[in-house]
UniProtKB/Swiss-Prot annotation:
Cofactor(s) demanded: Cu cation
Keywords noted in UniProt: Cleavage on pair of basic residues, Copper, Glycoprotein, Metal-binding, Oxidoreductase, Repeat, Signal
Organism per entry: Albifimbria verrucaria
Name of protein: Bilirubin oxidase
Pfam families: Cu-oxidase_2, Cu-oxidase_3
Residues that make up the propeptide removed upon maturation: 20-38
Cofactor binding note from Swiss-Prot or TrEMBL: Binds 4 Cu cations per monomer.
Record's signal peptide: 1-19
InterPro entries per the UniProt record, alphabetical: Cu-oxidase-like_N (IPR011707), Cu-oxidase_C (IPR011706), Cu-oxidase_fam (IPR045087), Cupredoxin (IPR008972)
EC nos: 1.3.3.5
Amino acid sequence: MFKHTLGAAALSLLFNSNAVQASPVPETSPATGHLFKRVAQISPQYPMFTVPLPIPPVKQPRLTVTNPVNGQEIWYYEVEIKPFTHQVYPDLGSADLVGYDGMSPGPTFQVPRGVETVVRFINNAEAPNSVHLHGSFSRAAFDGWAEDITEPGSFKDYYYPNRQSARTLWYHDHAMHITAENAYRGQAGLYMLTDPAEDALNLPSGYGEFDIPMILTSKQYTANGNLVTTNGELNSFWGDVIHVNGQPWPFKNVEPRKYRFRFLDAAVSRSFGLYFADTDAIDTRLPFKVIASDSGLLEHPADTSLLYISMAERYEVVFDFSDYAGKTIELRNLGGSIGGIGTDTDYDNTDKVMRFVVADDTTQPDTSVVPANLRDVPFPSPTTNTPRQFRFGRTGPTWTINGVAFADVQNRLLANVPVGTVERWELINAGNGWTHPIHIHLVDFKVISRTSGNNARTVMPYESGLKDVVWLGRRETVVVEAHYAPFPGVYMFHCHNLIHEDHDMMAAFNATVLPDYGYNATVFVDPMEELWQARPYELGEFQAQSGQFSVQAVTERIQTMAEYRPYAAADE
């Protein structure tokens, strides 16, 4: 019924390209003299723990559209990407930001499992953008391919399946060579999937009340209160001012009861070693439970007093304040370059994150629990096949994977993986002067092993669930195992240090299918498929909700998209 626009030459490249295995490549290692040293803060001093923790608002759909194929609802949203200013320092000038709906972080999506969504991202900013719903098994055309940009004055409709189990996803910019600056200035937000199975566990709940988003970033400011740009940075942008939900070093009033915290490291380059401490004994780490990681709940809670989290990782923890009534608890960040695992520069105050002021009593009894059994995690079937090897390093000034940069269009496709295949990938960081959080699009993976490393760190107990990002510390090798399903297409994998990503530490893999796969596959294989490209718009039409933004036009557009059945394979 529908024709694809993928040319013969492109099809040949996708289905016949040979994977490039890891081989020795020239590497230049930066000096490591800064490790384990604390240096003076460069940004102006900020009055810590004086501003309450902000909670991003919940995004509401503009309308619902009936799917003509199955009769189910599709929720339609509009998000305007636009510049705005924000008074960060109370006694200095404002900072120039660009955010989703003119806020940073962007609004939080809360979507029930099984409800498809179409989100129209409208670029009313000055720079191109591309949006990645991180952790979703979106079709390639809606996955935020780095070159699939939306220019200013255009919009793109992203169609999301929301078929996965409950989990904390996030959406952020992914535009070629400008992801760091776009995300740094505000283009990031949470996208939460919910489902009845998780709700039935009776974990601490109530968004913004006892279920708290915690989006971590690290920035740097000029003497007048504006942001220092990331442009021109080639190694890492650490930042010396820690933010939670866009606010430097906030505080939160809490009750002496259990709270669920959804941590996301949305920083450009900074990783964290998070722990809770009583201000009466600041060097003593308090126990808490990790209940979920990138791809949803663990099988069992993991008890710990220290949580390593790198860029793009998500962890959900439950901390019980009931033993600390009337006290002050701080969330802290481990110094010494995160215990020697990281290479981050420690500034005067980057060991502090935020403060919790615990009330003397609860307003109502705490009936929430943390069950010993959270769920049966759908791990991929084990494989004994030889792992593919991918070496993350540096070739001259360029960050590369197996010596290949993303700008090398002819060679950046490093793997062809038949849909439905389980594979092990060996991720290698031979460098001593950098670390790499590695994100593989489309899939959830199991962390099988972690070896070598300067600290002999193994797989942490809270890494026992499914993930989509794994942190490669200095000189570490990590093996991950994933089921490459449910969709064919060309997808990215890359380092999520956004400076490294922007400077080409990114590659592609092709989840392949036979030509007679049996349903409308090829129209979604190419992430640059013309059918789904961004479209120009008139600002007046958007503001008046007319033309392409009228209810009739939006309904027709979404129903046409649904007729292609982009997510039919997930139901088979």
